[in-house]
């Protein structure tokens, strides 16, 4: 369920503190060098992708501080109810302590004191990109204050739990201490700042005249563009350009009040990929000493701008980072370069590019007022963490006297515990490194949800009781202070979506209450409710789900709204079958349309990503009952069945799960029914996300420690996270080195999980995926450990006999074509079938397969493994069983889905028959093609059995049955290994051989048993 905060106990009795004025309140806060420290998110509750943004962040500067009476000291208006009753105190009452705890002497009158606490931090990143709790200090004096030797603690029995090191708080300035447990005692200020602004600006656009369509045999994929040109428009947007100057400006870079600014209105053309502004550096700059970019300015709200560099004349190999707009000119955006730019060489940066990839009818406006690169330094980090459910903090000087204290209880994620200019503590909008924003509230309005029935499926009217002052909206619109006030008791008898918030004077608004009441029988499948603003999602002109006004005529309708990379906040609830009024969970997250060519389908695929700013960083729920080990998710997808939407329900689930038990990663899934704002939208395929967070869920790895490479529509291996440098270096080495020798083979086998690669390749080859390997191929490793590269199986819509599959030749030639997969190769020579074109660079899509097959041991293992898999995972019996199982899961819901979307039931039935026919006949086709390609001799059957507790491995592949008959080839020796289970011992083979690993020749050995005891 969505978390609702209760009982925010504001139980400290505070002294009223009148703080000094810290500068002219009208003073501009636009510092050309930007803020000093901290990665701050916008005070609006909009989500952020790759980095964060702030509308007010100026530590260490001379900007206005907390307003007061203008003095540099801290005069006190004493509270007669103070338990401490210490003159000059600004502290809150320490919590009751045990009799053994000695409360430090309270001294007070410190120029440095607590000004804000954020135990649930959702909008401030530390130097490592994490978001621990934090406490803010303010120095109200006219001189810096040295805190060396001072202490911070949350436990009076340990008053010097954490001690400040080299920390000086500048005059009239704020300072953050992160409560992370990392124990960084020093305050390292930013350094090595480089002004990246320049008056030399131009624009570039990439557009394709045919809307992204590729003709068969041209080597492209359905999601990419067919050509299109790069158009540069030096000095500003020209007539017909997709990058125009700001209104009233004659150039993209212009002088405003004596300072250079960058401004543009950008739009992606029909069928295009991007439009961007290119800002040259003053010289070819080195960024070797910097680890952060700081960009201040306006970006259209919820639109994304991708920042990248040109190194020399070309775009860098770094994938860049997204800035998500807030619609505020004073917003500050941060990009971390230390961990996120491993493919950036940094020593020859000639320009910065600001690109929009936002498709649709809307344009994206930017106005950059300052842009620097720097070494960000870091704030101090305490050696302890703060309890998000509440606690206390104490500030103690070197002599052991208490200077300040603050108590706090559980704080809503959207708020902090903040002190205003009059010394009053309360809930407020988080404002790290800045003045308290707006009013502070002593408490949050509480709503007894027990009186409001849960979301769900109902057949009779329900009654909900709301507290006085509750304002609600229907249909998915978010409530505001202007929304209608509802009656205390509301009766609901038809499908209704309610979004409500309780308001009361002097109190922080309640958490949002979201309910969806669907008046119909619960479906037999699990259901997902998606609640969101209806105009943002479904407005004919601007709705994210809709085509809009800027779409190309041809599929995939590039330029349509659904090609936008915008995200929308949504509330998602799930209902398991048989539990119509018991939501399994309810979470806020960001919604994004996903997919490539399939976006043009009426039913859209989408992804939901959890963000801490909405309350929860991870969904802790077993989404997939067949895989109870998967319990924590950053994100999940709901697919429309890809390019087969409206054709079948099984192809991709069947194709990706073929490797179950083989160690190849794939997206687990289940079928669900989706409702948008209470309206039925049919069957979707709930799947894991195939990004870096998959490895956190599956293996517990840090998602920031994953090198994840994707071969995408551009046809190159790009790092979606981490770095591609080592992988590309390996491919470069393979261009000039064969793997015939064991030494060279070992060099690659030390970097690549060869068994994993064989299993992956053979799955793709069996299902005959023609949208691969020039597209839809992913490989990954743990970066810090430099583990071996493994592969990820996904997006197999083009397999299992789909009508638009253009790959009709020999699949072994297809994956060994030196020029890639745009045409058919015809094998190697000398025992490997036919002659292949030679000379020139080998395609990065096929070079690994080509080189590995040069090694005799690998080639034999590859052939033998395929033989086993044709009798195991790829056998007709197993595949048909899987097809029937998948189809039976959706059977009862198919008719409604087909009627709602206008699918042809007869056509879908024929498509299912095609899938079954392929699953039964593909084994023979693979054998024919393999025999032709490798020039193999006649097959020979061999029965392999295990007796006792153990199993047999065939060239490294473990059999999953105790007895299996496999058809091998007489001229390809088979390596067998007997592997005992724990507690068991291998005693020998049935023919008297005692070596655990042995080679046998098919035809000479027809049956053998491994014996264990």
Residue ranges of predicted features:
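Disordered, low-complexity segments in secreted/periplasmic proteins that are enriched in proline
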Residues: 66-67, 205-243, 466, 547-549, ...
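Intrinsically disordered, low-complexity linkers and terminal tails enriched in Ser/Thr/Pro/Gly
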Residues: 23-33, 42-53, 57, 62-63, ...
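C-terminal motif of bacterial Sec signal peptides marking the signal peptidase cleavage site
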Residues: 18-21
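Conserved ATP-binding subdomain of kinase catalytic cores across diverse folds
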Residues: 558-715
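Middle-to-C-terminal accessory/interaction subdomains
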Residues: 432-440, 526-528, 535-552, 559-562, ...
């Amino acid at each position: 369920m969505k978390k609702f905060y209760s009982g925010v106990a504001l139980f400290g009795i505070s002294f009223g503190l009148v703080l000094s004025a810290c500068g002219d309140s009208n003073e501009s806060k636009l510092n050309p060098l930007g803020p000093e420290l901290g990665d701050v998110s916008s005070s609006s509750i909009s989500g952020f992708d790759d980095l964060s943004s702030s509308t007010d962040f100026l530590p260490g500067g001379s900007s206005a501080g907390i307003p007061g009476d203008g003095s540099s000291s801290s005069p006190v208006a004493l509270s007669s109810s103070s338990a401490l009753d210490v003159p000059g105190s600004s502290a809150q009452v320490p919590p009751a302590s045990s009799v053994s705890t000695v409360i430090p002497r309270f001294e007070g009158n410190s120029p440095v004191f607590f000004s804000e606490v954020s135990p649930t931090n959702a909008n401030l990143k530390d130097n490592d990109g994490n978001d621990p709790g934090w406490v803010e200090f303010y120095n109200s004096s006219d001189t810096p204050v040295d805190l060396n030797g001072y202490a911070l603690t949350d436990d009076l029995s340990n008053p010097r739990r954490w001690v400040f090191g080299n920390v000086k708080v500048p005059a009239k300035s704020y300072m953050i201490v992160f409560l992370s447990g990392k124990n960084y005692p020093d305050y390292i200020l930013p350094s090595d700042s480089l002004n990246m602004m320049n008056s030399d600006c131009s624009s570039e656009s990439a557009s394709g005249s045919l809307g992204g369509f590729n003709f068969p045999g041209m080597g492209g994929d359905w999601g990419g563009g067919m050509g299109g040109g790069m158009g540069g428009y030096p000095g500003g947007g020209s007539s017909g350009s997709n990058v125009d100057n700001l209104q009233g400006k004659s150039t993209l870079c212009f002088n405003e009040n004596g300072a250079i600014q960058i401004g543009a209105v950008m739009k992606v053309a029909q069928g295009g990929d991007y439009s961007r502004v290119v800002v040259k550096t003053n010289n070819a700059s080195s960024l070797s000493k910097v680890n952060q970019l700081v960009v201040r300015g306006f970006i259209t709200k919820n639109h994304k701008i991708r920042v990248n560099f040109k190194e020399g004349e070309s775009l860098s190999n770094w994938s860049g980072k997204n800035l998500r707009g807030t619609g505020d000119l004073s917003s500050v955006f941060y990009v971390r370069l230390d961990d996120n730019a491993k493919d950036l060489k940094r020593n020859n940066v000639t320009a910065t590019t600001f690109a929009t990839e936002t498709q649709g009818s809307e344009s994206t406006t930017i106005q950059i007022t300052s842009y620097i690169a720097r070494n960000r330094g870091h704030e101090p980090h305490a050696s302890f963490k703060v309890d998000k459910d509440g606690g206390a903090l104490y500030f103690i000087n070197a002599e052991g006297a208490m200077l300040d204290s603050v108590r706090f209880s559980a704080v809503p994620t959207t708020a902090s515990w903040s002190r205003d200019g009059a010394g009053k503590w309360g809930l407020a909008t988080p404002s790290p490194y800045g003045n308290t924003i707006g009013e502070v509230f002593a408490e949050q309005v509480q709503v007894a949800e027990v009186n409001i029935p849960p979301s769900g499926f109902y057949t009779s009217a329900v009654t909900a009781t709301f507290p006085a002052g509750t304002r609600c909206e229907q249909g998915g619109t978010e409530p505001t202070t202007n929304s209608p006030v509802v009656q205390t008791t509301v009766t609901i008898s038809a499908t209704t979506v309610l979004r409500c918030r309780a308001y009361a004077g002097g109190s922080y608004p309640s958490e949002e209450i979201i309910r969806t009441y669907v008046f119909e029988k619960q479906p037999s499948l699990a259901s997902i409710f998606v609640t969101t603003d209806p105009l943002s999602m479904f407005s004919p002109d601007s709705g994210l789900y809709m085509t809009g006004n800027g779409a190309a005529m041809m599929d995939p309708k590039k330029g349509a709204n659904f090609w936008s990379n915008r995200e929308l906040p949504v509330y998602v609830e799930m209902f398991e079958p048989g539990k119509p009024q018991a939501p399994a969970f309810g979470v806020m997250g960001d919604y994004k349309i996903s997919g490539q060519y399939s976006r043009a389908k009426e039913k859209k695929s989408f992804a939901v990503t959890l963000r801490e700013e909405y309350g929860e960083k991870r969904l802790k729920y077993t989404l997939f009952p067949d895989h109870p080990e998967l319990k924590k998710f950053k994100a999940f997808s709901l697919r429309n069945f890809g390019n087969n939407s409206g054709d079948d329900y099984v192809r991709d689930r069947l194709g990706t799960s073929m490797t179950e038990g083989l160690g190849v990663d794939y997206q687990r899934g289940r079928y669900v029914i989706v409702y948008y704002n209470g309206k039925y939208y049919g069957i979707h395929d709930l799947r894991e996300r195939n990004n870096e967070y998959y490895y956190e869920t599956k293996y517990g790895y840090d998602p920031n420690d994953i090198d994840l490479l994707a071969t995408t529509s551009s046809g190159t291996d790009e790092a979606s996270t981490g770095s591609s440098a080592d992988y590309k270096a390996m491919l470069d080495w393979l261009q000039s080195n064969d793997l015939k020798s064991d030494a060279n083979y070992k060099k690659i086998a030390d970097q690549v999980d060869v068994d994993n690669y064989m299993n992956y390749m053979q799955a793709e080859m069996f299902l005959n995926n023609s949208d691969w390997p020039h597209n839809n191929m992913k490989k990954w490793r743990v970066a810090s450990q430099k583990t071996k590269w493994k592969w990820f199986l996904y997006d197999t819509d083009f397999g299992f006999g789909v009508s638009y599959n253009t790959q009709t030749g020999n699949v072994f030639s297809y994956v060994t074509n030196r020029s890639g997969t745009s045409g058919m190769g015809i094998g190697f020579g000398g025992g490997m079938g036919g002659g292949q074109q030679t000379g020139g660079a080998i395609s990065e899509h096929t070079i690994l397969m080509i080189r590995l097959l040069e090694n005799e041991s690998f080639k034999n293992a590859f052939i033998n493994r395929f033989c086993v898999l044709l009798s195991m995972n790829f056998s007709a019996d197993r595949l048909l069983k899987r097809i029937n199982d998948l189809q039976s899961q959706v059977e009862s819901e198919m008719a409604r889905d087909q009627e709602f979307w206008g699918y042809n039931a007869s056509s879908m039935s024929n498509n299912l028959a095609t899938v079954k026919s392929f699953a039964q006949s593909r084994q023979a086709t693979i054998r024919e093609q393999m025999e032709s390609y490798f020039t193999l001799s006649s097959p020979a059957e061999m029965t392999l059995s295990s007796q006792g507790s153990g199993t047999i491995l065939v060239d490294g592949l473990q059999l999953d049955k105790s007895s299996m008959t496999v058809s091998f080839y007489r001229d390809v020796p088979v390596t067998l290994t007997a592997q005992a289970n724990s507690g068991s011992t291998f005693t020998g083979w049935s023919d008297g051989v005692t070596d655990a690993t042995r080679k046998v020749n098919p035809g000479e050995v027809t049956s053998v048993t491994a014996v264990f005891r």
